[in-house]
Amino acid sequence: MSLFDHSLTKLHELLAAKEINVSDLVDVSYKRIADVDSKVKAFLTLDEERARDLAKKLDEVDASEKGVLFGMPIGIKDNIVTKGLRTTCSSKILENFDPIYDATVVTKLRGAETVTIGKINMDEFAMGSSNENSAFQVTTNPWNTDYVPGGSSGGSAAAVAAGEVPFALGSDTGGSIRQPAAYCGVVGLKPTYGRVSRYGLVAFASSLDQIGPITRTVEDNAYLLEAIAGHCPADSTSADLPVPPYRESLTGEIKGLRIGVPSEYIGDGVSEEMRKAVFDALNVLEKEGAVWEEVSLPYSKYALAAYYVIASSEASANLARFDGVRYGYRTDNADNLLDMYKNTRAEGFGDEVKRRIMLGTFALSSGYYDAYYKKAQQVRTLIKKDFDDVFTNYDVIIGPTTPTPAFKIGAKTDDPLTMYANDILTIPVNLAGVPALSLPCGFKDGLPLGLQIIGKHFDEATIYRVADVYEKATNFSKEKPSL
């Protein structure tokens, strides 16, 4: 049994009782990475020397006087900047980028005295649903290494599922925390837009991006969100609201809780095993005292199209900063300034990033702005209204995280539209800005299935309460892959 099979609370108790020390935890992490990462390929850069030095210092501290995250090893998705630790966004254009500052979430974690183990693989600039778009390596699913771990935070989900770290940070623009969490059988939360600072998150789509926690259990997830959430003066979109003690929301009580189940989330395109897993989960929650009814989110059918117009348009603007002048890769193949811009971007960006930049530039161009970008934003407003209407009568919305379990590596790389459809059930949440969590709810042919719980704006606490009740009434979160 690995130390990382324990909850954060239990690990903290062991530290406080001096039965283990921080160096033991760091040792477990690096040993596990050495043992299995040649198969999983989750980590891009390890920070071993600094991590071990910090662990030795923390060994001298009385853990009983510290918070639950004290001394805990963590992995950071490679689009979250870390001072003095390479941050690549899994792109050749940032292959040797060494940030001069920490993201706000990293600063908060350092304040909580966690230990950063290293930076984790992802789809390039967070654009992808399978982790196959990384310029450096393809992360695999620990449950079956022939299958994808999901994307774009597939490396973070795989690292946690494989027991390399007890928890990790990811980012979610259209499902990039929840979909990998579902595929890898772990717990992943996309917080309300504005709940967690984006300062230091390399921007993909600024109105959609949100950093969130990926963990083994719901309780661990609540602890990690509490540590990273809160207002940040450096991020004008972060909400100036108090951060609730999320761990205290895990009361075990959901009697009378009202659940809405969108008919659009359990209809055509959703596999039979996924549909059955959702209804089985609803039966579990019903026995615990909740009530559920079918509801409708009619504009969800337009979410995928609206998302790819909005996200690509914002990416087109955000990625204009990677030009070979200020930082990152610069081509050697240029006779003049214009050639330098063109060739740097042509050589530095991968195919999917180029595809989205082109799509976004087209949608923002003169003559097409009203027809595409403006219309997509109008659809976004209608999608948000759908959620608002349902939440007037219901506490949470529940459905599958993904239409199917994970697919084989290489199965969809030649068909971008089929790949995009993997996020059809997660994208509406980002467009509406509401929080949502995925947690394990079953297996099909040895691959995990994910249940998605969606909450009201800034009501992550209710999501955690429901998820915790379900997790404790089932055994799915206790299952581990055998690597």
Curated annotation (Swiss-Prot):
Protein family (similarity comment): Belongs to the amidase family. GatA subfamily.
Lineage: Bacteria, Bacillati, Bacillota, Bacilli, Bacillales
Protein function: Allows the formation of correctly charged Gln-tRNA(Gln) through the transamidation of misacylated Glu-tRNA(Gln) in organisms which lack glutaminyl-tRNA synthetase. The reaction takes place in the presence of glutamine and ATP through an activated gamma-phospho-Glu-tRNA(Gln).
Gene Ontology CC terms: glutamyl-tRNA(Gln) amidotransferase complex
SUPFAM superfamilies tied to this protein: Amidase signature (AS) enzymes
The gene coding this protein: gatA
Alphabetically ordered keywords of this record: ATP-binding, Ligase, Nucleotide-binding, Protein biosynthesis
The reaction(s) this protein catalyses: L-glutamyl-tRNA(Gln) + L-glutamine + ATP + H2O = L-glutaminyl-tRNA(Gln) + L-glutamate + ADP + phosphate + H(+)
Highest taxon, organism lineage: Bacteria
The enzyme's E.C. designation: 6.3.5.7
PANTHER family associated with the record: GLUTAMYL-TRNA(GLN) AMIDOTRANSFERASE SUBUNIT A (PTHR11895:SF151), TRANSAMIDASE (PTHR11895)
Active site: 77 (charge relay system), 152 (charge relay system), 176 (acyl-ester intermediate)
One BP annotation, GO: translation
Keyword ATP-binding: yes
NCBIfam families: gatA
Natural source organism: Shouchella clausii (strain KSM-K16)
Subunit structure: Heterotrimer of A, B and C subunits.
Top EC class for this record: ligase
MF terms (GO), sorted A to Z: ATP binding; glutaminyl-tRNA synthase (glutamine-hydrolyzing) activity
Protein name: Glutamyl-tRNA(Gln) amidotransferase subunit A
